């Protein structure tokens, strides 16, 4: 109960901050584009793409790929603390796998990016393990910010397509569960991550 209450408090704070900053924390774009990003937000983040890494990453991708070239679909899932402690929300992991599979089928010419932040990174790992190798072979790149599974390979993924961004001394990346200021600063890595994803898309 206390864990759930804390999660609700953090979500409310995140949404209030997003509103103040004018950041859109929800993205649902079913239409095919040159690049399709499937993104899972972190624990207790608002919307379906969150606040602390997703929106700045998408903006940087749009600059590099061109106006209208990037479509983003956020994963709808609980993003609870309990899910994080389970190694990534099981239903959310399955939902992400389903979105990726559907995107591969419906947009065969798109460059598909699987991405997530914090617990969203756990979902990337879990979804990749659920997907067949043939589907994963069609993924252009995988980008994780603040990965709780840092150092563990992503199943069925070509390592050259993977970028994991973890700051030195980051508690979550070290496999622990204490959220410190460093965990909230991944927006500063947006350009580097977008540069990687754009290069992979054009390879």
UniProtKB/Swiss-Prot annotation:
Q: Name one GO cellular component term.
A: extracellular region
Question: Is the keyword Hydrolase in the record?
Answer: yes
GO BP terms in the entry: carbohydrate catabolic process; symbiont entry into host
Q: Where in the cell is it found?
A: Secreted
Signal peptide extent: 1-18
Q: What InterPro entries does the record tag this protein with?
A: AB_hydrolase_fold, Cutinase/axe, CUTINASE_1, Cutinase_monf
> For this UniProt entry, what is the primary localization, expressed as one broad class?
secreted
The record's section on SMART domains has: Cutinase (SM01110)
Q: Which domain of life is it from?
A: Eukaryota
A molecular function annotated in GO for this UniProt entry is: cutinase activity
Q: Which reaction does it catalyse?
A: cutin + H2O = cutin monomers
The name on file for this protein is Cutinase pbc1
């Amino acid at each position: 109960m206390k864990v759930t209450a804390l999660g609700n408090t953090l979500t409310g704070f995140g949404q209030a901050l997003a509103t103040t900053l004018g950041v859109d924390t929800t993205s649902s774009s079913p239409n095919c584009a040159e690049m399709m990003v499937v993104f899972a937000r972190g624990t207790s983040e608002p919307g379906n793409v969150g606040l602390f890494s997703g929106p700045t990453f998408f903006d940087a991708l749009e600059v590099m790929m061109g106006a209208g070239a990037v479509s983003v679909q956020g994963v709808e899932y609980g993003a609870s603390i309990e899910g994080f402690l389970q190694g990534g929300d099981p239903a959310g992991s399955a939902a992400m796998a389903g979105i990726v599979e559907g995107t591969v089928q419906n947009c065969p010419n798109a460059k598909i990016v699987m991405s997530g932040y914090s617990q969203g990174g756990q979902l990337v790992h879990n979804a990749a393990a659920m997907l067949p190798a043939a589907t994963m072979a069609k993924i252009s790149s995988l980008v994780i910010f603040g990965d709780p599974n840092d150092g563990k390979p992503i199943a069925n993924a070509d390592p050259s397509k993977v970028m994991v961004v973890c700051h030195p001394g980051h508690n979550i990346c070290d496999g622990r569960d204490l959220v410190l200021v460093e965990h909230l600063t991944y927006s500063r890595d947006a350009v580097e991550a977008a540069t990687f994803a754009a290069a992979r898309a054009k390879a």
